[in-house]
Design a protein with these regions (language model features):
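GH16 jelly-roll
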Residues: 17-320
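Boundary/junction segments of secreted and surface-exposed precursor proteins
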Residues: 17-18, 319-338
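Extracytoplasmic/periplasmic beta-strand context in beta-sandwich domains
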Residues: 27, 128-129, 144, 305, ...
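Short stretches within intrinsically disordered, low-complexity N-terminal or propeptide regions
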Residues: 183-185, 202, 348-351, 375, ...
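Short beta-strands within extracellular/lumenal beta-sheet-rich domains
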Residues: 211-212, 375-387
Length: 387
């Protein structure tokens, strides 16, 4: 999926201001109690044309090699097929992998988030990531996404950015030599015919102001690296720590404003090792001619040693467990009746109508001037809802 960069307002920040505070939450992967293991291939390869089927068997807790007593979560990508390894339409797939998330278990809002990760050889077709998704019920990208780290970017992306952060400007990097980060949100200005989701992305800026990738031509796949996102109500910025040297992925700070206010809400953690799809140079689901064949060596094992959340100044919140229960009167199709809470479609909720089953109706509102009315098309089963 092509994502668009926009012009943003800037705030100034000095490197001396970038200091993590106390640790307020830490996941050391002694178990998976905080995590949900996802399965399947999603809708059209998780929306990206990915080629893997996620299985619980591909996620396990292991001891980090040469670090006795230190555990990590290991996500293993394999070349395998079987009767139950299919896409949503039942077509066979040739790869499996793992994906985990903390939705309804752990969420974070602001702070410095750091993770320590070891990536396998992913050349070609691997797409490992540790990232965050907004807890909002809105669909992507209106719920927001923060990519703490991801690798496997296609050649055109790597060539576009390779004059900064260790790049040599020769357009000759491999996927094992480049790692990036990103923040994605919805913007009307990004809604164009070849970007129907309206996803705006700070990593696609050709000037590399807000989120430039990090290059190391000795490869990034033979050692653990640390990755950070610094996040407060005003800004988001990223860094990579390689051999204990912190490399900042920005020259101008990305300023959170009314367009990107998704980042004023809580997010949950996701980690996965995808294969193929439109982020990579490999082909996409259902279209073998769209890219190269998967060539990375299997099994490919990604290790996430820890994830920790630290204060950044006064900011940093972690919630463990489901969202807090709210009581009171909730407005459902009310206009004048006083309520304690409600939902605004397009802001914190979406209206869903089963395609082709309903048309606009003419029932008048019970009160006030606003209402929703549908009529069935008479095609049988019909449905709609608000989420």
């Amino acid at each position: 999926m092509k994502k668009y960069i926009m012009c943003f307002l800037l705030i100034q920040i000095s490197f001396s201001q970038i200091n993590p505070g106390e640790v307020i939450w830490e996941e050391n992967f002694d178990n998976l109690d905080n995590w949900i293991i996802e399965t399947g291939n999603g809708s059209w390869g998780w929306g990206n044309g990915e080629l893997q089927y996620y299985k619980p068997e591909n996620v396990e807790i292991v001891e980090v090699p040469e670090e006795t007593g230190n555990n990590a979560v290991q996500i293993t990508a394999k070349e395998e097929s079987g009767a139950d390894i299919t896409d949503q339409w039942g077509n066979p797939l040739n790869y499996t992998s793992g994906r985990i998330n903390t939705k309804s278990k752990v969420s974070v809002k602001y702070g410095v988030i750091e993770t320590r990760v070891l990536i396998p050889d992913i050349d070609l077709g691997g797409w490992p990531a540790v990232w965050l998704l907004g807890l909002s019920n809105l669909t992507w990208p209106r719920n927001g996404e923060i990519d703490i780290m991801e690798m496997g970017q296609r050649q055109s992306f790597r060539d576009l950015h390779d004059e900064h952060n260790g790049g040599n400007g020769l357009n000759n990097s491999t996927v094992n030599q480049v790692v990036g980060a990103n923040a994605i949100f919805y913007a009307d200005e990004a809604l164009v015919p070849d970007n129907p989701t309206g996803a705006a992305s700070i990593s696609w800026d050709p000037d590399d102001d807000f989120c430039r990738p990090y290059y190391n031509y000795d490869n990034l796949t033979d050692r653990f690296l640390k990755y950070r996102v610094y996040w407060n109500p005003d800004s988001i910025l990223f860094s990579v720590i390689d051999n204990e040297i912190e490399h900042f992925l920005f020259t101008d700070v990305f300023n959170i404003d009314s367009v990107s206010d998704e980042f004023h809400s809580p997010f949950y953690f996701v980690s996965n090792l995808a294969l193929g799809g439109n982020f990579t140079d490999a082909y996409s689901l259902g279209d073998p001619a769209s890219g190269s064949q998967i060539e990375l060596p299997f099994p490919a094992k990604m290790l996430v040693d820890y994830i920790k959340v630290m204060k950044w100044g006064e900011y940093g919140e972690v919630n463990e467990g489901p969202p807090e229960f709210q009581g009171g009167d909730f407005g459902l199709f009310t206009d004048l009746t006083p309520t304690d809470n409600g939902l605004t479609p397009g802001l914190d909720a979406e209206i869903y109508v089963w395609e082709g089953t309903l048309t606009e109706g003419d029932i008048q509102p019970y009160e006030g001037e606003n209402g929703i009315a549908w009529s069935t098309t008479g095609l049988g089963w019909f449905g709609a809802g608000i989420m």
